[in-house]
């Protein structure tokens, strides 16, 4: 399996979710299964089947997170000598050449992406267009809504 790039914040969020699933959700579901078993016939016991389905989901998510964390490559953009270039973890201020609107994005791992918070996946069209570019460069992005052109105003590594 290939390395999964994560920011330190993204890795910490995954660790917190894993901890919650193991210490809160797993015991709660085990208790729900035990209570449902006490109600008798398991074939027609909706509570039992719902709890088992939840258990399956939680155990699957635990395995998924453990796999991602074991293959994680935590990247601190401030520690990389990027010399003004856009790299994974960088925060980039852009100006849309058509509308003049300013936008700010941080390039993060798949699991961290949240466009509403300005966090774009390293595999997204905009991140792929930005990687390796520097302040002052114009980039063309093949977005779902058509081609967009942006100017890179500032690149930060925080």
UniProtKB/Swiss-Prot annotation:
InterPro entries noted in UniProt: GreA/GreB_C_sf, TF_GreA/GreB_CS, Tscrpt_elong_fac_GreA, Tscrpt_elong_fac_GreA/B, Tscrpt_elong_fac_GreA/B_C, Tscrpt_elong_fac_GreA/B_fam, Tscrpt_elong_fac_GreA/B_N, Tscrpt_elong_fac_GreA/B_N_sf
GO molecular function: DNA binding; RNA polymerase binding
Pfam families reported in the protein's UniProt record: GreA_GreB, GreA_GreB_N
The keyword Transcription regulation is assigned to this record: yes
Top-level taxon in the UniProt lineage: Bacteria
Tagged with keyword ATP-binding: no
Residue spans crossing the bilayer: none
Protein's GO biological process: DNA-templated transcription elongation; regulation of DNA-templated transcription elongation
Coiled coil: 53-73
Keywords assigned: Coiled coil, DNA-binding, Transcription, Transcription regulation
Purpose: Necessary for efficient RNA polymerase transcription elongation past template-encoded arresting sites. The arresting sites in DNA have the property of trapping a certain fraction of elongating RNA polymerases that pass through, resulting in locked ternary complexes. Cleavage of the nascent transcript by cleavage factors such as GreA or GreB allows the resumption of elongation from the new 3'terminus. GreA releases sequences of 2 to 3 nucleotides.
PANTHER family, A to Z: TRANSCRIPTION ELONGATION FACTOR GREA
Family from the record: Belongs to the GreA/GreB family.
HAMAP family in the cross-refs: GreA_GreB (MF_00105)
Name this protein carries in UniProt: Transcription elongation factor GreA
């Amino acid at each position: 399996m290939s390395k999964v790039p994560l920011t330190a914040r993204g890795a910490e969020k995954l660790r917190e979710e894993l901890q919650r699933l193991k210490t809160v959700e797993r015991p709660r579901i085990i208790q729900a299964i035990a209570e449902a078993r006490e109600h008798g016939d398991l074939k027609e016991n909706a509570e039992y089947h719902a709890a088992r389905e939840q258990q399956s989901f939680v155990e699957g998510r635990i395995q998924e997170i453990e796999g991602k964390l074991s293959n994680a490559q935590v990247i601190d953009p401030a520690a990389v000598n990027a010399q003004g270039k856009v790299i994974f973890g960088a925060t980039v201020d852009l100006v849309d050449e058509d509308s003049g609107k300013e936008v700010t994005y941080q390039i993060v791992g798949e699991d961290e992406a949240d466009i509403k918070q300005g966090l774009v996946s390293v595999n997204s069209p905009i991140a792929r267009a930005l990687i390796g570019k520097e302040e002052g460069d114009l980039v063309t992005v093949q977005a779902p809504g058509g081609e967009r052109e942006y100017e890179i105003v500032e690149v930060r590594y925080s």
